[in-house]
Swiss-Prot record:
The keyword Transmembrane helix does not apply. It is found in: Cell outer membrane. The gene is lptD. Together with LptE, is involved in the assembly of lipopolysaccharide (LPS) at the surface of the outer membrane. Keywords: Cell outer membrane, Membrane, Signal. This is LPS-assembly protein LptD. The lineage of its organism: Bacteria, Pseudomonadati, Pseudomonadota, Gammaproteobacteria, Aeromonadales. PANTHER family: LPS-ASSEMBLY PROTEIN, LPS-ASSEMBLY PROTEIN LPTD.
Length: 810
């Protein structure tokens, strides 16, 4: 055995050139990262994958000394060095082995033969044939090579690998690529030739085919693929879905890399039941502080127009389109912000989102928001302005008032014994009369509102375990109001009191000044308990609030942005009965609440129970609309909330608001959830009185009374079952049903899912059913084809999965 330490790196350089050349070509679908986490499959799939090895930070791999071992070293005449028998070359973490290696000192040609092995800590290459290389030109050629990427299941082979131009150009002939474990090659990508130019973004493959087991299933005469995390103009992979509403739905996107900070995606979407839709998205970022996008969809003629009453009754033809603009800008070291969120569909196209499900736009209660905002923010003050309009997506909905604009100023100051806040707002409320007329609605009152409210908060007691705060507020509001003669009958009826004495709205200047006094306090008691088989800490937290606001009749003021607040535990300790500023309710009320929590010995909250109720000394007299019946109730609904972490698997939640005067539930919600590793199941229920559209009687409302069941569970190491079921109990309507089955192996998966969704038509308000079937086949590390989602999410098309448990650290 001969061992030498050399001052040059000739022998190791034979294969050093392989790494930068070969890696991008075969790793483009799976970067050099740890194997993908698949949970229970990890130990079964990836035990053969070698770990990534690196030198210590700061060390240069090329500067490390080279050690060569061989059974025999022979120096031939003419300057040729021959290494024979168990040749081993080491340089840092790099390793190179062969049976025979020959170096011509003059031509700088190198030949290695037999049992070739190369490992640089990131990739391993082996061959039983020949490696030829030149140390000056860096051109190399390897016959019948196999490769395995470290930290990744990516592996494969090539009949011949040729590297030229200082390793910038690589050609692989007879190449194969897979992420399947050895002996389990479910899929393999084979190509007659692959060319890589490392100065380019994409590699190119000719005569490529995808094989499943021993059978070719797809053939690509030519295909390109990314070798860098950069963008390039060209066709993207097509998409395909199938649904009962649109039928076969095929998308073919084309990507246009205009510049490093500008690009566009142009997509042709063919729906065999509707026609051809064009989609264009343009994205821009002139610098990191300014970013935005423009998006447009256009369907020239919807083939469903003549057959769909909700379309041909609302629009004159089948032309359908959507426009979306989104922009954000930051100025003055991010102190100033400007944002635009604008989405529009064709007028009276109420079902556009139901039919095409675009992934853009902000929808709030069947209204498309169109907003331009600007703000300037400092530590103790800020000023914001917003212009906001809406487009209605529900034929029977009343057109809302628009902000034209709103200017809002907030000031905060914290002293040693007080907190001062001052909110000032100026809003001009407009109304889209043209759209209202298009919806067969009349005009509406408009106005300008000025509101200012200084608020002084003084802590009276602030000790460990108890506190008492007092708050003083003075609210001044001024309206300049206009009331048209052709006002919508909806508004006329709302502002006509029960006695029928005529519309109460006043025109001109209206002022309102109201003081507010608030006293709020609470205490916390603790005791140690022996619960859950260990030490626990239980708290008892009583709290109270007294709120006084004098009465002032406000029936002459229009309702622009106000609505009744949702009733729950927390609303009982608010200083408002109405959201918005158009109605400030009188109040002479005491709210009392009691919360108890249990913490285990680790400090995790395991149980939270809370109950509260408010008592009015005088029933409030302010109403949202004069037509409403004045309530004489002096007690709020009794509010209850409870959460429990029963153990590491079981969680429970319940909440209810009980109307003690009418002896009935106002609302309730509950959930019971079981979680263990990848198994999640949840049974939930929600009830809200008079909060749902009556699908049998148009224009009427009924109770929302819905039960849901969700499940996702592994059946074994490979099979996974998931689904969701939502049922409207009062209307016997199955809101959403979804069931799926997924098979997941080391290198491929297949997912079947079937879903039925019932949503009301936004014109007829009749339920419409949508059925979709998804089949998703994924080759890990290569891509996926098919329809539907490849995940096992608990989300359904109609409702998202929510964990309603209000426990700390959960």
């Amino acid at each position: 055995m001969t061992k030498r330490t050399l001052g040059y790196s000739y022998p190791i350089a034979l294969t050093i050139s392989l790494v930068p050349a070969l890696t991008p070509a075969i790793v483009q679908a799976a970067p050099l990262t740890p194997p993908p986490a698949t949970g229970i499959l990890d130990g079964l799939c990836y035990d053969y994958v070698p770990k990534i090895e690196k030198l210590a930070p700061g060390k240069d791999a090329n500067a490390q000394p080279v050690e060569v071992d061989a059974d025999r070293l022979e120096a031939k005449q003419g300057g040729t060095a021959v290494y024979q028998g168990d040749v081993k070359v080491r340089q840092g973490v790099r390793k190179f082995d062969s049976d025979y290696a020959e170096l011509d000192q003059k031509s700088r040609d190198v030949i290695a033969i037999g049992n070739i092995y190369y490992n640089d800590g990131q990739i391993t290459v082996t061959s039983d044939k020949t490696l030829k290389s030149n140390l000056d030109t860096k051109n190399s050629e390897l016959e019948e090579g196999k490769y395995q990427v470290h930290g990744s299941p990516v592996r494969g082979s090539a009949d011949r690998v040729t590297m030229t131009n200082n390793n910038q150009n690589i050609t692989l002939e007879g190449a194969q690529y897979t992420t399947c474990p050895p002996g389990q090659e479910v899929w393999t990508l084979k190509a007659g030739s692959i060319d890589i130019d490392q100065t380019e973004v994409f590699g190119e493959a000719w005569n490529a085919s995808l094989w499943l087991y021993d059978y070719p299933v797809f053939y690509f005469p030519y295909i390109n693929f990314p070798i860098k995390d950069e963008r390039k103009t060209g066709l993207l992979y097509p998409g395909y879905t199938q649904s009962s509403k649109n039928g076969m739905d095929i998308t073919q996107p084309f990507y246009w890399n205009i510049a490093p900070n500008y690009d566009a995606t142009i997509t042709s979407r063919f729906m065999d039941r509707r026609g051809l839709m064009e989609q264009v998205q343009f994205r821009y970022m002139p610098d990191p502080a300014h970013v935005g996008s423009l998006y447009f969809e256009n369907l020239a003629n919807d083939k469903q127009y003549d057959e769909t009453p909700s379309l041909n009754q609302a629009m004159s033809d089948g032309h359908r389109y959507l426009l979306n603009a989104n922009h954000t800008s930051l100025f003055a070291d991010n102190a100033m912000r400007v944002s635009l969120d604008y989405t529009k569909v064709r007028d009276r196209d109420y079902n556009y989102f139901n039919d095409f499900s675009p992934k853009v736009g902000t929808q709030v209660e069947n209204q498309l928001q169109q907003s331009l905002m600007a703000g300037y923010f400092q530590p103790n003050w800020n000023i914001n302005t917003e212009v906001r309009t809406y487009q209605i997506l529900l034929a029977s909905a009343q057109q809302p008032h628009e902000l034209m604009p709103r200017i809002d100023h907030n000031y905060y100051q914290q002293g040693s014994w007080y907190d001062l806040a001052w909110n000032t707002e100026i809003t001009k409320f407009g109304y889209n009369n043209a759209q209202a007329i298009a919806q067969n609605q009349g005009g509406a009152y408009t106005g300008t509102r000025v509101y200012t409210a200084p608020t002084l908060t003084m802590p009276l007691i602030n000790e460990a375990g108890y506190y008492l705060d007092s708050q003083y507020k003075l609210m001044y509001t001024r309206y300049d109001q206009e009331v048209p003669d052709n006002m919508s009958q909806t508004f006329v009826s709302r502002f006509t009191p029960e006695n029928g004495n005529g519309v109460t709205l006043d025109e001109g200047i209206i002022t309102r000044t109201l003081p507010s006094f608030r006293l709020k306090g609470g205490m916390t008691f603790e005791r140690n308990q022996n619960w859950f088989g260990g030490d626990a800490n239980q708290t008892l937290e009583p709290e109270f609030q007294y709120l006084y606001v004098p009465y002032k009749n406000q029936d002459n003021i229009g309702v622009y942005d106000s609505t009744s607040m949702r009733q729950d535990y927390y609303s009982l300790f608010s200083d408002r009965r109405y959201a918005g500023l158009d109605r400030i309710s009188d109040s002479n009320r005491v709210s009392i609440g009691l919360t108890s929590r249990v913490y285990d010995e680790a400090g995790d909250e395991r149980i939270r129970l809370a109950v509260a109720q408010a008592f009015d000394f005088v029933a409030p007299r302010v109403k949202l609309y004069p037509s409403e019946t004045l309530t004489t109730n002096t007690r709020s609904p009794l509010s209850f909330e409870g959460d429990a972490k029963i153990n590491e698997q079981w969680f429970a939640h319940a909440g209810a608001q009980y109307d003690v005067d009418q002896s009935r539930l106002s609302s309730a919600n509950s959930a019971l959830e079981y979680r263990r590793e990848k198994l999640i199941s949840q049974l939930n229920h929600r009830f809200v009185r008079d909060a749902n559209y009556d699908l049998e009687n148009k224009g009427q409302v009924t109770d929302l009374n819905q039960i849901g069941l969700l499940l996702t569970t592994p059946l074994n190491d490979q099979w996974h079952l998931y689904g969701g079921y939502y049922q409207e109990l009062n209307q016997s309507v199955k809101s959403d049903r979804k069931v799926g089955l997924k098979y997941d192996s080391c290198c491929w998966s297949i997912n079947f899912n079937l879903e039925w969704v019932n949503t009301p038509d936004n014109v007829t308000m009749r339920p419409t059913s949508e059925r979709s079937l998804g089949i998703q086949f994924e080759m890990k590390g290569l891509g996926s084809v098919g329809t539907g989602s490849k995940g096992t999410s608990l989300d359904t098309e109609a409702l998202p999965y929510i964990r309603p448990f209000n426990l700390r650290d959960q």
